[in-house]
Amino acid sequence: MSRYHTFTAADAVEYARQFGQVADPQALVTADEIGDGNLNLVFKIRDTAGISRVIVKQALPYVRCVGESWPLMLDRARIEAETLLTHSQFCPQHTVKVLHHDAELAVMVQEDLSDHHIWRHELIQGNYYPQAAEQLGEYLAQTLFHTSDFYQSAQAKKAAVSRYTNPELCQITEDLFFTDPYIEHERNNFDPVLLPEVLSLRQDKALKLAVASLKHRFLSQAEALLHGDIHSGSIFVADGRLKTIDAEFGFYGPIGFDIGTALGNLLLNYCGLPGLAGPRDAAAGREQRLNDVQTVWQTFAARFLALSQEKAQDPALATEGYAAQFLQHVWRDAIGYCGSELIRRTIGLAHVADLDSIDDQEMRRACQRHALSLGRALILVAPHVDDVGGVVARIRQSPSSLTPQRC
């Protein structure tokens, strides 16, 4: 098999036998399609005992929920595989292992993570993994530092920026994050009862100026090789372990984007918890989410600083105090992108179960309103914040009262 064709289950089994790196390839006999996304086919390859051994993932040449009228380039499969391989080079313990990939077939074979669980599902169910936030911070620090100008040579970095140019998937992000939620668009999806809040966002000139700045940075700042879609649904967890998957949105962009989207998903769970659990469990879970937000940032920042002191290759960027100064700019970006994630996941095309799975309609609407107000506040306060503790304290005291003053 060399020319592109859409895999059947039988094709996936045969491919896994060739490239799955299992000791007994002929024992691989069945493939279950498990993908619930719109861009790919994903198969679990099982052996004669019914045990899942490897994953086969193939990119589709169109958006699945729309059909061939929305075509996509298959090169995104190469970008995803190479992003995961690069991230695995610097943080193998927290990156899914790529066993094989073929750019022409737009297919990749990955390790099976059946002994892990999707973090979003675990957060919704109230299952706490105390090491996950620290591990996520470590992953972000290792991958973003080692693909940045602090570590890469200027020549290597410029070549990598070109190699990881990902225009179609970046366009999706640009539209869904920074454009659609602030205009009337057919892709937007929200409860009509929320229309007053939606119209208020569209009419808020200060907010739209701040979002324009975030979008401009996303378009123009090639700071490091991002995962590009790091959220609690693209993170698998187990006791003491964490693995990231699904890096097809990978590209060179602003470091704060990966951090902000990760933090945004923790805060989406924070907003949804009153509708997902009883009062006592919701209060405890919300405190955990705020602690997780602090831990992710503090771990990332401390590790990034340590790496810059140990490994910074550029003598100018190694100047004492510069990395800390740079991280202030990253932090402010992260808070803005965090707010963007809250808004777009509430009223845009792609929602999250942290809000949408709330059974009680009035409670769900209240949680969605909270997400919108918190997202707006974070975007507006982002240029004025100095540290994570100040932001978390304000969220804890009064979730909707963030104002553009220094924290």
Swiss-Prot record:
The gene is mtnK. NCBIfam families: MTRK. Substrate binds at residues 229, 344. It comes from the Bacteria. GO terms for molecular function: ATP binding; S-methyl-5-thioribose kinase activity. Its EC number is 2.7.1.100. It catalyses: 5-(methylsulfanyl)-D-ribose + ATP = 5-(methylsulfanyl)-alpha-D-ribose 1-phosphate + ADP + H(+). This is Methylthioribose kinase. InterPro entries: Aminoglycoside_PTrfase (IPR002575), Kinase-like_dom_sf (IPR011009), Methylthioribose_kinase (IPR009212). GO terms for biological process: L-methionine salvage from methylthioadenosine. Belongs to the methylthioribose kinase family. ATP binds at residues 40, 57, 111-113, 246-248. It holds the Pfam family APH. Keywords: Amino-acid biosynthesis, ATP-binding, Kinase, Methionine biosynthesis, Nucleotide-binding, Transferase. It is an enzyme of class 2 (transferase). Homodimer. Catalyzes the phosphorylation of methylthioribose into methylthioribose-1-phosphate. Pathway: Amino-acid biosynthesis; L-methionine biosynthesis via salvage pathway; S-methyl-5-thio-alpha-D-ribose 1-phosphate from S-methyl-5'-thioadenosine (hydrolase route): step 2/2.
